[in-house]
């Protein structure tokens, strides 16, 4: 089922995504592939984005991080968009088939050598406002936040990572209602927000 587009920002975002084909990373032997979903809904006249907090899991480099629904590709996935759809259904119970695929963002890879070699493909979906969310064991919480909140100056912050040698690394981050979004998710959101900001003026809450 294709969910009807009812918000001008959604229309404009779909057009903006269509106007700029995403940059795809060349295939590298042995490199893992993954996909994430930027789930958008319209609530009280504002476009909102779903963020999740991953459960604490030993051995998971993204344990406890704020993130987007998604995960690694499987051999039977019919492309990376299908990977994003399957992982979203498994992690948060949302079937993106009830909505619409708006487009894709550029592929990204981790910048840290401590993270496994992987390429992540982000996809943007519009889903119904009343979509049901059911978290599995991999996800601690799901949060809907107005996209325009992330565009405000006070959402810009830093994540401080303390090293064993006593030094501290600083990473650019977003403050999403008290939850710090950094790393690859911050990079994905930065690219998305740059595009979204071009689609219209900020929305007033109702």
Predicted feature residues:
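Short, charged, solvent-exposed linker or helix-capping segments at domain edges/interfaces
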Residues: 133-137, 154-155
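A mid-sequence, solvent-exposed acidic-amphipathic segment
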Residues: 150-158
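Acidic, glycine-rich loop-and-strand cores that form catalytic or ligand-binding grooves
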Residues: 135-149
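N-terminal leader/linker segments that precede catalytic domains of diphosphate-processing enzymes
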Residues: 1-67, 72-131, 148, 163, ...
């Amino acid at each position: 089922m294709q969910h009807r587009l009812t918000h001008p920002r959604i229309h404009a975002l779909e057009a903006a995504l269509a106007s700029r084909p995403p940059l795809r990373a060349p295939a590298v032997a042995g490199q893992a592939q993954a996909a994430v979903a930027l789930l958008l809904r319209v609530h009280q006249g504002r476009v909102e984005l779903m963020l999740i907090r991953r459960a604490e899991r030993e051995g998971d480099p993204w344990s406890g991080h704020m993130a987007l629904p998604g995960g690694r590709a499987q051999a039977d996935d019919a492309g990376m968009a299908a990977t994003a759809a399957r992982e979203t259904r498994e992690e948060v119970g949302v079937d993106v088939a009830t909505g619409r695929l708006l487009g894709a963002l550029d592929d990204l890879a981790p910048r840290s050598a401590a993270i496994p070699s992987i390429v992540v493909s982000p996809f943007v979906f519009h889903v119904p406002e009343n979509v049901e969310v059911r978290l599995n064991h991999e996800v601690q919480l799901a949060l809907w936040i107005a996209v325009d909140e992330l565009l405000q100056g006070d959402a810009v912050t830093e994540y401080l990572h303390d090293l064993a040698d006593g030094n501290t690394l600083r990473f650019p981050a977003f403050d999403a209602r008290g939850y710090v979004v950094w790393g690859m998710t911050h990079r994905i959101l930065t690219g998305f927000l740059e595009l979204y900001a071009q689609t219209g003026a900020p929305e007033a809450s109702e």
